[in-house]
């Protein structure tokens, strides 16, 4: 059964985030041609800051669009030295500063926070031990995350996560299941 047209807005820091998310969403059954990517300009200063400051604007666009068509929004931002909850709180503060509501419970708006960064997850998903404080090297090519993302799809589709799964990765799977999966399931009915 095909899914009717859904636009997913992907707000992210860089091409590695984009490649990782596109492969994940495709593996979860979404049409990757229906993803609109808003990515930090490469020479535009802090990518984290760009994503954080762009979030309220894209949230407004999402709220308007969802009245017209089934839509979702996913923001990906590295935790760096902060915690997952710290990054989520920063998004809320950006919305508060613009006097707008952060996220309603029924909104298909997910915030994904790789800790320390996306390379931590890729390293783990490729079968290595990790800790979320260490910095792991970038891939030579963004598309090199294929095996890692395929393993993530298996993890997110399983009922139980392994005990050594990084907490931020578990939180991301939970965020997807809670915020994005209900929209997809409703489109399949």
Model-derived regions: residue spans:
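C-terminal accessory helical subdomains adjacent to catalytic cores in phosphodiester-
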Residues: 1-7, 16-41, 54-189
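Conserved SAM-binding loop
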Residues: 10
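Phosphate-binding/switch region of NTP-binding enzymes
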Residues: 13
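Eukaryotic endosomal/vacuolar membrane-trafficking regulators centered on PX-domain-mediated PI3P pathways
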Residues: 43-53
